Amino acid sequence: MLINGWSGSGGDAFPDYFRKKQLGPLIGSRTWGGLIGISGVPELIDNGSITVPTFRMYNTDGTWFKEGHGVDPDILVEEDLAAMAKGTDVQLERAIKEIIGLIKSKGFKVPPIPGYEKRN
């Protein structure tokens, strides 16, 4: 899974759960680290607004999800903006390389397609 600092909120939680289920490597750079959410944005008389944290995520074991740090990758690949400006995404290229390596070493089997459901 590709991750970087633009991944936040669910983009922090999903890679964490992906890792805990050992579904594959996390490739890229650390996620943003923001999982305390807001609900509603009251407007102020000067047309500004204010937000107040109102909820937070926790793990399935009942512990709080680590706020403020993000999820570290298994394979660190920093973004290269100069390469990206030339059309090369070094994080994506590394992920493709890793996936090809995993397919070669572990194989790949297409899961069966379920039959169509009957809706009445």
Where are these regions (language model features)?
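C-terminal "post-core" interaction segments
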Residues: 1-120
